[in-house]
Every structure is written in structure tokens, then in C-alpha cells.
């Protein structure tokens, strides 16, 4: 169960503890880890997502983008091999989108975490993703690189998607 971590689309549906540190510590605490190991995991996860300076802040005092980062940190504190995210850029301004997508790419490239995300924002795909799957009504229509998948415009239209701007 620790191999896969899930991050919800809306961080307000995932966060529940009063402070950032308490929220990120929740998962490791429930694993029965030592206080030192929990503190180490919390510090490491907050550092990975750039939220170390906010560790003692109230969750309610954070911006939407900061809350998304805390959700990711909470999952990272569980040391997953796979991170599944539902619309991680939803509700973010362009700078926030770039920041979150860069973070996810770094988690994959530097830490070996497999990133799986659901998104309708096809413009992100060629820039940040090595492989993708196009789904429609629960069925996988095509799997491959962005170039392979987006070369079949009929399938893209069938899935009610548009081609990325850079395609």
C-alpha cells in the first residue's frame, strides 16, 4: 500500500491537519515510525516541494498552489514508488503550473518516482511527459510518446481532446 501515493485535484479535499507539519506527518505517524524518522520524512518531503519555510504555518493560511505542494509532500513522506495525481495544475496560474510540473519532472528524474497524472491540459504533455495514454470513457485508445499519440488526429477528436499548441 505504500508503493502508490495519490494526490487529489482539490487540496482542500486532502488536507485536514491544522498545520503543514502535522499534515505531512500524518501518514508516517500511522506507520508507527519513530519520532526521529517521522521528523526526517517530514523535513525531507517539505524540502523536496519547496515548503520548508512554511512547516509551522496553518494550512488555511496557504495559497491554493502551496496547498497542492503540501499534499504532494504528505504523499512523499510515505516514500511511494509511484505518485498518481488528479489534475495537478487545475486552478493554478501559469507560473504555478510551471512550478508544479517542474517539481513533478524533478521527482521523476532525480528521485526515480514514477509520475502518473490525469490531465485535460494537453499542452503540458509534449513538454513534461515521456509517455502518455489517451483515454475515453474508461478505455485506453492509445499509448506512446506525445508524437506517436498526437499523430492520430482522429483518435484525438474521438477522445474530445485538442492537439497541443506546439503540435
What are these regions (language model features)?
Residues 58-62:
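Conserved ABC ATPase signature
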Residues 79:
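Conserved catalytic motifs of ABC-family nucleotide-binding domains
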Residues 119-120:
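H-loop/switch region of ABC-family ATPase nucleotide-binding domains
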Residues 125-127:
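A short, surface-exposed alpha-helical micro-motif characterized by mixed small hydrophobic
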Amino acid at each position: 500500500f505504500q508503493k502508490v501515493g495519490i494526490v487529489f485535484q482539490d487540496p482542500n479535499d486532502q488536507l485536514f491537519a491544522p498545520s503543514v507539519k502535522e499534515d505531512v506527518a500524518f501518514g508516517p505517524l500511522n506507520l508507527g515510525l519513530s519520532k526521529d524518522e517521522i521528523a526526517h520524512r517530514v523535513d525531507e518531503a517539505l524540502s523536496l516541494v519547496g515548503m520548508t519555510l512554511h512547516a509551522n504555518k496553518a494550512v488555511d493560511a496557504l495559497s491554493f498552489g502551496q496547498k497542492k505542494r503540501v499534499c504532494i509532500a504528505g504523499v512523499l513522506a510515505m516514500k511511494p514508488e509511484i505518485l498518481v495525481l488528479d489534475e495537478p495544475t487545475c486552478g493554478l496560474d501559469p507560473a504555478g503550473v510551471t512550478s508544479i510540473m517542474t517539481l513533478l519532472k524533478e521527482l521523476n528524474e532525480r528521485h526515480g518516482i514514477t509520475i502518473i497524472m490525469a490531465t485535460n491540459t494537453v499542452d503540458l504533455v509534449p513538454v513534461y511527459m515521456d509517455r502518455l495514454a489517451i483515454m475515453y470513457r474508461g478505455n485506453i485508445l492509445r499509448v506512446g510518446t506525445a508524437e506517436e499519440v498526437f499523430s492520430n488526429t482522429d483518435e484525438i477528436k474521438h477522445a474530445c481532446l485538442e492537439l497541443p499548441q506546439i503540435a
